[in-house]
Design a protein with these regions (language model features):
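Vicinal oxygen chelate
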Residues: 1-2, 6-14, 42-45, 62-85, 88-123
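Core segments of cupin and vicinal oxygen chelate
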Residues: 10-51
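Short beta-strand
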Residues: 33-36, 70, 97-98
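A short, compositionally biased micro-patch
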Residues: 37, 47, 77-79, 99-101, ...
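Active-site/binding-pocket entry motifs
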Residues: 50, 58-60
């Protein structure tokens, strides 16, 4: 049973609206259709796929600040455009290059501290 592709990341949050806005404005994801679950939340889409699922919880998960998820990653295009967007928004980020390749990487955090890693295969 080989893996085929990345499907989605599921994040628990007490701030669904703020997190939705971040993923919409910074990464360009679109809020879209979501099944009628018995709990509140939002699904954010990259094209036809809901890649970020937000699940509303009463209080912020893991109040100690210790993250259980190290990072999640997307492939992307438009390195310069996104770097400028992060700079203008005042979002701290780190640029790196994947050793032995032309892949540039951007790493930054969403409003709740989850690390987002973007690979730009076109350098």
């Amino acid at each position: 049973m080989p893996l085929i592709d990345f499907d989605h990341v599921n994040l628990r949050t007490a701030h669904v609206a703020e997190m939705s806005e971040f993923y919409r404005t910074v990464l360009g994801l679109e809020v879209g259709a979501r099944p009628a679950f018995s709990f509140a939340g939002a699904w954010l889409y990259c094209g036809e796929r809901a890649v970020v699922h937000l699940v509303e919880v009463a209080e912020q998960p893991n109040p100690s600040g210790e993250l259980r998820l190290e990072h999640f990653a997307f492939r992307a295009r438009g390195f310069d455009e996104l770097e400028q967007k992060l700079r203008v928004a005042g979002i701290e980020y780190r640029v790196s290059k994947l050793f032995g390749t032309e892949i540039r990487q951007l790493n930054f955090h969403d409003p709740e501290g989850n690390r987002i890693h973007l690979d730009f295969p076109d350098g």
